[in-house]
From Swiss-Prot:
Its EC number is 2.1.1.67. GO terms for cellular component: cytoplasm. It is an enzyme of class 2 (transferase). It is found in: Cytoplasm. This is Thiopurine S-methyltransferase.
Length: 213
């Protein structure tokens, strides 16, 4: 992951990847994890996502990690929340407020506690292929025994678009999470009117996965 690339995106407010509302995939498929309020939730590379609010309405503890300090501060400021901020190192800060615990810094070194449920909408697809194996190793290490992941990926011809977001095809998903129970919940194929197809992609699909340890 090119950290400078993402830092510049947030600094210049070029954040087309940020959705102004809850992702409909989350509201439709979260129930597939059989979640309970007491179960803890982790959202990697969370940005200032509205999905965090949706999850906090249903869970007592929602944690996240985000590279950009700008994004983390914006998350709390836009909601008029005043978090407790703890400096853990020169490159890592912890923001605490009610249900929310968000680390601003490197995903690979943030001390995330083991969690029951993970929601990954925009993290895996933000990473180039050479980083995805290490990313998933860390993700799996943070999932409790019996834990579950709701994963959203994209499938398109990587030769036709450089990314991010990157294509993570089914065979790679199954390889990365081998040894776990993997269920494809949905494949949403873009039609001819989709912006990506209009820009020249021959196919573009969003896939939703339920993964159990």
């Amino acid at each position: 992951m090119d950290q400078e690339f993402w830092q510049k995106k947030w600094a210049s407010n070029v954040i087309g990847f940020h959705l102004p509302d809850t992702n409909p995939v989350l509201s439709e498929f979260w129930k597939a994890l059989n979640p309970t309020r007491e179960q803890t939730v982790f959202v990697p590379l969370c940005g200032k996502s509205m999905d965090l609010d949706w999850l906090a309405e249903r869970h007592n503890s929602v944690s996240g990690v985000e590279l950009s300090q700008i994004a983390v501060r914006a998350f709390f400021a836009e909601r008029l929340y005043t978090p407790t901020v703890t400096t853990l190192s020169s490159t890592l800060e912890l923001y605490d407020f009610d249900e929310f615990t968000i680390f601003a810094g490197d995903y690979f070194t943030a001390p995330i506690e083991a969690t029951d449920l993970i929601y990954d909408r925009a993290a895996l697809v933000a990473l180039p292929k050479e980083m995805r194996s290490e990313y998933v190793q860390v993700l799996r290490s943070r999932l409790k025994e019996g834990g579950r992941i709701l994963l959203v990926t994209l499938d398109y011809d990587q030769n036709e678009m450089s990314g991010p977001p990157f294509s993570v095809p089914e065979d790679e998903v199954r390889s990365l999470f081998s040894g776990m129970s993997i269920t494809k919940l949905q494949r949403d194929e873009a039609d001819a009117d989709h912006p990506r197809i209009k820009k020249g992609l021959t196919r573009f699909a969003e896939e939703v996965w339920l993964i159990k340890s």
